Regions:
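Short beta-strand->loop
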Residues: 36-39, 134-145, 152-155, 159-160, ...
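Ligand-binding pocket segment of bilobal, Venus flytrap-like solute-binding proteins
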Residues: 186-261
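C-terminal capping/gating helix-and-loop segments adjacent to ligand/active sites or protein-protein/ligand interfaces
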Residues: 300-377
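A structural signal for short loop-to-beta-strand junctions that line the ligand-binding cleft
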Residues: 86-91, 109-150, 168, 178
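Periplasmic-binding protein-like
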Residues: 177-182, 290-312
Length: 377
């Protein structure tokens, strides 16, 4: 009799375990999602909140979300150190070449979205050099288009008698001490913009131009986020290499600022990838799919960013954040409605050796000699 009772108990426990295992396997997504990202909380916080709301509505699952904020080089290094056992599910933001390098190391999972959604995203954007918007091998995909441009204070520029429309306007002597920028070894947006000048003019003439810019620079900030902030507060007239959403956040906060997208300025697709060994892979894949949906792309448009696909445009009712984005960037609704100039070649800028060369040259020839450059020595 005792044996029969024991057999019944084991049968019950086995069925219970199997039921729970099957239930967890059938669950559409996990209830947690973690990012490691250089993308500002002005963007990743609304994106995570919107996804959590979406998951609750679609699957009735409460998803706990969080982000590990790290600069691009630090985030990349951290992922390498994790060695396939990451403490985050997704890497979001930075240059596509870093994602390519992680894929080569076997540290990324293929992106799993519908073929129709994948095909809607163009392979590249820009001429004469096409900037990749997705990985041909499928390990990363762009999420939104974000220009690195110039933020300025209209009233302050008017007082100085200066107009800002393109890069060379920054070299006006009237802007002496009025420009803010972040060092290229601390900011991917600054580094990419330095590369734009180096690839436009060549190594020697490009550095000559950047030294002239340094002569008008009043501050090198420690973080790229600080550049639009000091301009918004009126401490400086112009900010160099500012991501559009960072500039737009200052406008939304009530500051009188404007944004210029100069010729051949770098446009990042804000790449996203699922990390190999991600603790919550289903939630990670669902997050990517959500951001590329109409709802996700509309969210970006409210934050000063642009759709990654020609299918959507920045538009909304009068007075909406979407229309403020359009006005803020000079009437632009889509990068696919206009010719986009791009000289940034990832094959040149991407290798680790090149990145170190640019950063090293900057530190030795500009950062260490900045006072002399300002004095014209």
């Amino acid at each position: 009799m005792k044996g029969k009772w024991m057999a019944a108990i084991f049968l019950f426990l086995g069925a219970f375990v199997l039921l729970n295992f099957s239930s967890s396997q059938a669950q559409p997504i996990e209830n947690e999602l973690y990012l490691i990202t250089p993308v500002s909380k002005d963007v990743h916080d609304p994106a995570l909140k919107a996804f959590a709301d979406y998951a609750k509505k679609k699957w009735n699952i409460d998803v706990k979300t969080s982000a590990i904020p790290k600069g691009t080089p630090v985030a990349y290094g951290q992922i390498l150190e994790w060695k396939g056992k990451p403490q985050a599910d997704i890497f979001w933001g930075g240059e596509g070449t870093l994602f390519d390098a992680l894929a080569v190391e076997g540290l990324l999972e293929p992106v799993k979205i519908s073929k129709a959604m994948w095909d809607e995203i163009p392979t590249t954007i820009g001429k004469p050099v096409g900037l990749p918007l997705k990985d041909p091998k499928g390990f990363w995909v762009g999420t939104t288009l974000e220009p690195y441009g110039l933020i300025y204070q209209p009233k302050l520029l008017k007082r100085l008698g200066v107009e800002i429309k393109d890069w060379d306007d920054l070299l006006n002597p009237k802007l002496k001490g009025q420009i803010a920028q972040c060092t290229p070894d601390r900011s991917s947006s600054s580094h990419a913009s330095y590369e734009v000048m180096l690839q436009t003019y060549g190594w020697e003439k490009g550095w000559e131009w950047l030294k002239k810019l340094a002569a008008n620079t009043g501050i090198f900030t420690a973080r790229s986020r600080d550049v639009p902030n000091v301009v918004a507060k009126g401490e400086f007239a112009v900010g160099f290499a500012v991501p559009s959403y960072m500039a737009f956040a200052e406008l939304v906060a009530g500051y009188d600022v404007m944004f210029v997208y100069p010729k051949n300025a770098y446009v990042t697709p804000e790449p996203m990838a699922v990390l190999k060994g991600a603790p919550h892979p289903k939630a990670a894949q669902a997050f990517i799919e959500f951001l590329l949906s109409e709802e996700g792309q509309k969210l970006f448009a409210e934050l000063g960013l642009y759709p990654i696909t020609p299918k959507y445009k920045v538009q909304g009712p009068p007075g909406s954040k979407q229309e403020k984005t359009v006005q803020f960037t000079g009437g632009m609704r889509s990068f696919f409605d206009m010719p986009v100039g791009n000289v940034y070649d990832e094959k040149i800028a991407g290798p680790k050796k090149r990145i170190e060369e640019v950063n090293s040259y900057f530190r030795k020839e500009i950062a260490e000699k900045h006072k002399e450059i300002v004095k014209g020595k």
